[in-house]
Amino acid sequence: MEVIRKTFFKKSRLEETSLEEIQLILASASPRRLALLAQIGLDPHQVYATNIDETPKLREHPANLAKRLAKEKALKAQETFLWRDQSSGEKVSAQKIVILAADTVVAVGRTILPSPESEDEAYECLRFLSGRAHKVYGAVCALNECGKITVKLVESCVRFRRLTSPMMEAYLYSGEWQGKAGGYAIQGKAGAFVVYIAGSYSNVVGLPLAETMDLLTAYHYPLLTHWNGKTH
């Protein structure tokens, strides 16, 4: 059957491997998620920066928002890495692929905190988190070339110490809040704000690794061969 192939694949790592190898595509340009994948020995064949509307729906629960956005990111990447067969109209791929997408939502109760775009927004996030417990909802989604899609949700609980004005001002000055859900990075200076954490630490950073491993295994991605080099 005749297939129209997207030129996106030209000069990419996808062309450097055999058709039998499953290609891992990360639907995120987040340096934190790339670093977490590298921590478990994974280097995606492609990194695709998705551009979707992340505005919460009216009265949408933070957990549902995380799951919806992770799924939408995977489906957005699917539009690039799969193409329609002219005869059947179905989306197909000449490669075996697994698209991995994730989203992180920080919330106090049902109040969703943004990824602040200004120091004022970041200050309000820190002030709101000061001395309180909050939830970090992490959703990870896998989608393969056959259209099989699975979403896993992870919930972590984090409590901040009471933050003084000098603490918040110094953290804002560091710039570490930029691009971070809830306006902080637990793996950075804000780790000194955390007095308690329950659940997955890697989820708070940006990608729940245990659940990611489970998903990739379920999609027959040979994760362990990246550790031991064995093919069987």
Curated annotation (Swiss-Prot):
Its main location: cytoplasm. InterPro entries: ITPase-like_fam, Maf-like. Keywords: Cytoplasm, Hydrolase, Nucleotide metabolism. Its cofactor is a divalent metal cation. Pfam families: Maf (PF02545). Its EC number is 3.6.1.9. It is found in: Cytoplasm. The active site is at D103. One of its GO terms (biological process) is nucleotide metabolic process. The record marks R32, T104, Q187 as: Important for substrate specificity. It catalyses: dTTP + H2O = dTMP + diphosphate + H(+); UTP + H2O = UMP + diphosphate + H(+). It is an enzyme of class 3 (hydrolase). One of its GO terms (molecular function) is UTP diphosphatase activity. One of its GO terms (cellular component) is cytoplasm. Belongs to the Maf family. YhdE subfamily. NCBIfam families: maf. Nucleoside triphosphate pyrophosphatase that hydrolyzes dTTP and UTP. May have a dual role in cell division arrest and in preventing the incorporation of modified nucleotides into cellular nucleic acids. This is dTTP/UTP pyrophosphatase. It comes from Bartonella henselae (strain ATCC 49882 / DSM 28221 / CCUG 30454 / Houston 1). The lineage of its organism: Bacteria, Pseudomonadati, Pseudomonadota, Alphaproteobacteria, Hyphomicrobiales.
